[in-house]
Amino acid sequence: MAELNFKAIEEKWQKRWMEARVFEPDRKAKPKEKKFYITVAFPYLSGHLHVGHARTYTIPDVIARFKRMQGYNVLFPMGWHITGAPIVGIAERIKNRDPKTIHIYRDVYKVPEEILWKFEDPKEIVKYFMKAAKETFIRAGFSVDWTREFHTTSLFPPFSKFIEWQFWTLKDMGLVVKGAHRVRWDPVVGTPLGDHDIMEGEDVQILEYVIIKFILEENGETIYLPAATLRPETVYGVTNMWLNPEATYVKAKVRKGDREELWIVSKEAAYKLSFQDREIEVIEEFKGEKLIGKYVKNPVTGDEVIILPAEFVDPDNATGVVMSVPAHAPFDHIALEDLKKETEILLKYDIDPRVVEEISYISLISLEGYGEFPAVEEAERLGVKSQKDKEKLEQATKNIYKAEYHKGIFKIEPYAGKPVQEVKELVAKEMMEKGIAEIMYEFADKPVISRFGNQAVIKIIHDQWFIDYGNPEWKAKAREALANMTIYPESRRAQFEAVIDWLDKKACARKVGLGTPLPWDPDWVIESLSDSTIYMAYYTISRHINQLRKEGKLDAEKLDREFFDYIFREPFSEEKERKLSEKTGIPAETIHEMKEEFEYWYPLDWRCSAKDLIPNHLTFFIFNHVAIFDKKHWPKGIAVNGFGTLEGQKMSKSKGNVLNFIDAIEENGADVVRLYIMGLAEHDSDFDWRRKEVGKLRKQVERFYELVSEFATYEAKEGVELKDIDRWMLHRLNKAIEGATKALEEFRTRTAVQWAFYTVLNDLRWYLRRTEGRDDDAKRYVLRTLADVWVRLMAPFTPHISEELWEKLGGEGFVSLAPWPEPVPEWWNETVEAEEDFVKSLIEDIKEIITVAKIENPKRAYIYTAPEWKWRVVEVVAEKRDFKAAMAELMKDPEMRKHGKEVSKLIQRLIKERAFEVKRIDEEKALREAKDFIEKELGIEIIINPEEDRGGKKKQAMPLKPAVFVE
């Protein structure tokens, strides 16, 4: 057969779908009970979509196609996200001829040179990639209703008005507030950064350090060394301080409010602190070695403690000043032990080694399972020898911190007897009230780089607008909604619950980037994770909005709060529709239609996206829905998918290790790409794209096409007499239907592909082997029937070639709208399946005997099936599942008593193997029917149950495990 022209077939059916408007649902066609509304996070248009994105968008398309075939009225719309700073940042970098950016867009995304330089204008980037993304989705065969297409920002005024309405609504509820809050900040551009504005480090947490002001008296001056800690309660156990002798530190005037103090911190810390409500005036810079050997006073205990050298102190983490609590911090304990061995370092700084030798650890916390100094014990338990054992040290630290926080009891007055969790808060609060401690925010990991290419800092912003996700009443409603939602996979539910718990105020607007201006404060632009939470509701009316725009009958400015309130939040009212019609110029009937559309399609049945959006978009989606819509309109389910890698490596545009979705389609065909990414892993697991494997799959898909094309020429005559192997094939087809259906209902795409494609293909291969040489009406009936079912099972995964094959089969209309196969009751036949499994197993056993026994030129095999009494034992054991009960029952039978010892051994064996589900078959009948096939497969003569006991094997025969002698 000539190589299949995937592209020609794809273009043919994409054109036909578009012409027939197959995927534009009419709400009047089916009752609300038969509607199915599924959406996926719309793509951000800063570049081409890659094969990782392909997974995210193919999953909902497969589910949409499956539900459509099940008879549902399916809405699967698509829009485009262009809000925020990233696109503006790209334009800026192209304008500045940034080599890395130029490389990505010219060499990785293959943007023609003459178009690339137009990208200095962000709108040109949007225009180019919006067109490219839509073409990619069409080429992929996505069953999208394109009449509802839109994009975000003020560049699309109707949607912008919708977002204004959303924010007015939230503000009226007290959920959008103004105030001071910590945010990730680009210090060069001067803007807050949301998750989508971060190029590297978007998952990095912000930590809240307590900085405790240790006192250095020098030349009549009081200078503070603020030590940063996540465990303020351990200030009572400080034995020394750590500074990095090679790092640069500064002495600076630090002003906060009406207070001015002298601080010594790392140079990096001084810069970062300047963004956190402090004025910093650097007086001098010096190396940390200048302070080594000096003493500072603990502001809580009054103890004088020495400053010791430590290269492990990172000047770019918090203040660069670290307090040492060796009884409860494994790093501190091991650093002191190392220092005791390296006396030359101490002598370098004129420190008497005995000072370090005589440091006494201070025990603060009682912890079950540990003695006085848990850090020492844990380091010993994990075999930590020195600071070089970094992984073990980090594990020891995690173990101790976690155990002490959750189970530790404080021993030091005035907090003796209280849990560490409580003491931590009390100590921090008391120190801050006394002015001896403050808060500093720091990233848990580095680097955090904005999409402008700049290192981010944490800034305290005043007069910033926030969505108050910390509101307790709002959190309660979000939890209620989540509890009533289906989450796939269910294991992700705990992550959603945790995010709801820790979510707090989130900056929702910034001063730069594309977007919708905040309606009451237009200097601010609503950011990308805040204008993308309820657009699924907008899809329900966007067809009408788009039609009005097309006809020049829409004045978007007139789409005010009253209009959207009526559509989305109020009961039907003819009077209201008339008033709104007069106000907006939109016909009252159209307004009524819009409301009908929303009420029909909502609630959203499924929201799909990748797992990285759980801590932001997907949880914001829940919050905003419960705030704005009636409970009956709250979303019903979220499906979360994993990521993709390329040839075992994480995809990276900058390293060129990326495969564009459209290139994958060009290389392999859309159907092959779809089937490959759906069959590689379950939707919630990560997958790895391997070109070699895709090539193999292409050949299998071509074989599928070839087989069905041949079967399409057969006639399926009714009333034919089927043989057992024919019944087996139809039974297995039933199993494939059942398995694929169940898997798709649960978004288990890999399992669905296994059933719909590989299982049918493998079963068909076996059937063709078993029926080789036959060309009768029964076989033709089975193969023609199989083709009809198989094409429909494959339609959600490989829609283009399935349409082509459906046409060859003479199917009615589009296979995309054909009924999804259902198991045929009369096809079920567990007996023929058991018999066929028996035959397969026997063939493999005989092959193994020949190989293991090294029998050269075998001539014949003698097969002995189990006697009736052994089957009786199997049946009784299956019923009783207990040795004594089974033995008692069987010994009632005189025939069984003749085999007493053998019965006893057999019962023991069956119970040990838990062989309780053995299905009885007529083994001899199955063997005689398959005798010719077995002989052909093995190339030897088969003799079934002869009188003579060749090789004394007869007694070894067991139910479903015949005894075999080969000669």
From Swiss-Prot:
Pfam families: Anticodon_1, tRNA-synt_1. Gene3D superfamilies: Class I aminoacyl-tRNA synthetases (RS), HUPs, Isoleucyl-tRNA Synthetase, Domain 1, leucyl-tRNA synthetase, Valyl/Leucyl/Isoleucyl-tRNA synthetase, editing domain. Its EC number is 6.1.1.4. It is found in: Cytoplasm. This is Leucine--tRNA ligase. A motif ('KMSKS' region) lies at residues 650-654. SUPFAM superfamilies: Anticodon-binding domain of a subclass of class I aminoacyl-tRNA synthetases (SSF47323), Nucleotidylyl transferase (SSF52374), ValRS/IleRS/LeuRS editing domain (SSF50677). ATP binds at residue 653. Keywords: Aminoacyl-tRNA synthetase, ATP-binding, Cytoplasm, Ligase, Nucleotide-binding, Protein biosynthesis. One of its GO terms (cellular component) is cytoplasm. It catalyses: tRNA(Leu) + L-leucine + ATP = L-leucyl-tRNA(Leu) + AMP + diphosphate. Belongs to the class-I aminoacyl-tRNA synthetase family.
